[in-house]
């Protein structure tokens, strides 16, 4: 039995000397000092010894086990240190290599134009209000001087939303103009100077010039003795700030049911200088927004007496402004999520 222990010690030590990795050490431990290893199996034969030899056998067994355990611990520490050193070498960073710039996000071009518009009007004393996208037919049409069956309703192809109330029609707003009524009824009887940006929806075929969803910025000014001159001065100042300082502005008569008189506002084409080109369709002018003096009926519906109060309103699209500034010929680019297009507006 003692010879068996000596043989195990000799072979285990030789095997341990050939261990080169932590995986090899784990295999060695299983074979020699583990619960089912050679040393454990040798200890089971102690019952076959003469009782007087058992203490000596146990002492010898313990000495061998302790010696192998100490050698194993020493080797394990050395292998772990070597493995850590190798890992650090493999993960070392070469500081002489050129750095890689962070991938920085960009604002959507519509967002850029919207923020620019808001900034310009904020410096003119306008507040920014937000209004609901789902509106009643009353606010979207009737209170804006378009009662049921009014022919002006045909100017907007409308999405109707199912309503729990059969007596109330609910729509996705076709313009931001319903916000005028909400603002007037909230601030009445105070003067008003606000812009209302937001999304609008129209049941139109998607094309290079139209989308079913688009953004719009509504403007509303209510006060005493507000005139067409105030409208022209405000919008001319906006055009100069938005496009260029010496831009020429013209006002063409138009029609909107909620303003009277109504105008379309154009600027001289800054691409061709008014000579006529593809962008301005050879006219020399670019349409940028619609505007007009608030209709007396709309004032009354908002809680203001048109005999005492007056005001003007205007509406524009951030996508339209962006298309003009950057010569973009298809509005669908704004909603295509094409990185090649969006990254041009960083």
From Swiss-Prot:
Cofactor binding note from Swiss-Prot or TrEMBL: Binds 2 magnesium ions per tetramer.
Known cofactor(s): Mg(2+)
Locations listed in the record: Cytoplasm
Superkingdom field: Bacteria
Name of the top EC class for this enzyme: ligase
Catalysed transformations (reactions): tRNA(Phe) + L-phenylalanine + ATP = L-phenylalanyl-tRNA(Phe) + AMP + diphosphate + H(+)
Pfam families, per the entry: Phe_tRNA-synt_N (PF02912), tRNA-synt_2d (PF01409)
GO molecular function, one term: phenylalanine-tRNA ligase activity
The EC number(s) this enzyme carries: 6.1.1.20
Primary subcellular site in the record, as a coarse category: cytoplasm
One of the GO biological process terms: phenylalanyl-tRNA aminoacylation
Record-listed Mg(2+) binding positions: 260
GO cellular component assignments: cytoplasm
UniProt KW keywords: Aminoacyl-tRNA synthetase, ATP-binding, Cytoplasm, Ligase, Magnesium, Metal-binding, Nucleotide-binding, Protein biosynthesis
Subunit note: Tetramer of two alpha and two beta subunits.
Family membership: Belongs to the class-II aminoacyl-tRNA synthetase family. Phe-tRNA synthetase alpha subunit type 1 subfamily.
HAMAP family the UniProt entry points to: Phe_tRNA_synth_alpha1 (MF_00281)
Protein name, per record: Phenylalanine--tRNA ligase alpha subunit
Species assigned in the record: Herpetosiphon aurantiacus (strain ATCC 23779 / DSM 785 / 114-95)
């Amino acid at each position: 039995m003692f010879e068996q222990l000596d043989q195990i010690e000799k072979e285990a030590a030789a095997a341990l000397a050939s261990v080169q990795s932590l995986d090899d050490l784990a295999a060695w431990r299983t074979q020699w000092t583990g619960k089912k290893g050679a040393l454990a199996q040798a200890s089971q034969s102690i019952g076959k010894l003469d009782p007087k030899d058992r203490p000596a056998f146990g002492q010898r067994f313990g000495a061998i086990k302790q010696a192998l355990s100490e050698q194993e611990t020493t080797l394990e520490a050395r292998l772990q240190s070597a493995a850590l050193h190798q890992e650090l070498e493999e993960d070392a960073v070469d500081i002489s290599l050129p750095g890689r710039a962070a991938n920085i996000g960009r604002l959507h071009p519509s967002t850029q134009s919207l923020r620019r518009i808001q900034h310009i009007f904020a410096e003119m004393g306008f507040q920014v209000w937000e209004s609901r996208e789902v509106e009643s037919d009353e606010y979207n049409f009737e209170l804006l001087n378009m009662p049921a069956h009014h022919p002006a309703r045909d100017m907007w192809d409308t999405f109707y939303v199912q309503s729990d109330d059969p007596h109330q029609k609910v729509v996705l707003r076709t313009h931001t103009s319903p916000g005028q009524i909400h603002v007037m009824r909230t601030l009445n009887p105070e003067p008003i100077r606000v812009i209302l940006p937001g999304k609008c929806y129209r049941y139109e075929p998607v094309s290079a010039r139209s989308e079913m969803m688009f953004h719009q910025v509504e403007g509303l000014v209510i006060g005493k003795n507000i005139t067409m001159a105030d409208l022209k001065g405000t919008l001319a100042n906006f055009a100069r700030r938005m496009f260029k300082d010496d831009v020429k502005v013209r006002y063409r008569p138009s029609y909107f049911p909620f303003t009277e008189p109504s105008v379309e506002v154009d600027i001289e084409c800054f691409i061709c200088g008014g000579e006529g080109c593809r962008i301005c369709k050879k006219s020399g002018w670019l349409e940028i927004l619609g505007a007009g003096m608030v209709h007396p009926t709309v004032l009354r519906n908002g809680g203001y007496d048109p005999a005492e109060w007056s005001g003007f309103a205007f509406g524009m699209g951030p996508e339209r402004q962006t298309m003009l500034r950057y010569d973009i010929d298809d509005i669908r680019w704004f909603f295509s999520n094409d990185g090649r297009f969006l990254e041009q507006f960083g």
